[in-house]
Amino acid sequence: MRKIKLIAVVGPTAVGKTALGIELAKTFNGEIISGDSQQVYQKLDIGTAKASKEEQEQAYHHLIDVREVNENYSVYDFVKEAKVAIDTIISKGKIPIIVGGTGLYLQSLFEGYHLGGEVNQETLMAYREKLESLSDEDLFEKLTEQSIVIPQVNRRRAIRALELAKFGNDLQNSESPYDVLLIGLNDDRQVLYDRINRRVDLMIDNGLLDEAKWLYDNYPSVQASRGIGYKELFPYFSKQIPLEEAVDKLKQNTRRFAKRQLTWFRNRMNVEFIMVGEENYQQKIKRKVSDFLSSK
């Protein structure tokens, strides 16, 4: 069976994934699937760095604004809905282009491990999400508790070993139906951090405080409120800290998040990054995509 060709644009926040995804969609007759766990929420546009209405008019976006703010969203939901979006795009004769920085979502979509049946698949992904939330120390402690020995201790092997221990023969390793071209974007660290700081300032100027205050007043305890861009501002609204301190915390958390994203994509998905500061980097990427799409 011939595999479905997918393009995936990944990398840290603020590196330029949205702009590149739109450019590739326009060049190669594609549609975009958002691979971001926060952009699924309606009414949360600024803090999630959602593609603007103008950007969405340039290329159709799937999996944006598909949940109410008070609804939960899981890796299982993403995989199920992304597969539907892929099939829809393919049926139009177009190329699916996945753009996002939520590594667990993308990895779970691309790999072939699964359990038989809908309910079991949801169980597997919920368990994986739980393991991913653990620190390295707690994760490796679970290996020790269950007397699991793996040849090389790293997070990916540890999580796979724990999944096998829990689900045993029910965990099937089927071949992925997708042939994925991973395009990783990165930039000089200080340049990226400066861009993050400027973007936070721009978000504040564009109305992030009003957006976050609405969330704080109406849905302070939902899953969406725990995302970066909102939780840092809640202590300001409750008069615990001044605005300047809250904004500094938001910048700091975003920079740390970018670092974690880079680590994830390097270590878990073996992404080779292209530096956006390189001359003609978009042209190089377009040639790479063209070669990929024309190959059998």
UniProtKB/Swiss-Prot annotation:
Claim: Transferase is one of the keywords in the record: yes
Keywords: ATP-binding, Magnesium, Nucleotide-binding, Transferase, tRNA processing
EC number: 2.5.1.75
Gene Ontology process terms (BP): tRNA modification
Pfam families: IPPT (PF01715)
Cofactor section: Mg(2+)
EC top class named in words: transferase
Binding residues annotated for ATP, in chain numbering: 11-18
Keyword Transmembrane (UniProt): no
Domain of life from the UniProt record: Bacteria
Substrates-to-products reaction catalysed: adenosine(37) in tRNA + dimethylallyl diphosphate = N(6)-dimethylallyladenosine(37) in tRNA + diphosphate
Family to which this protein belongs: Belongs to the IPP transferase family.
HAMAP family: IPP_trans
Stored PANTHER family: TRNA DIMETHYLALLYLTRANSFERASE
Assembly notes: Monomer.
Protein name: tRNA dimethylallyltransferase
Organism from which the protein derives: Streptococcus agalactiae serotype Ia (strain ATCC 27591 / A909 / CDC SS700)
Lineage, opening ranks: Bacteria, Bacillati, Bacillota, Bacilli, Lactobacillales
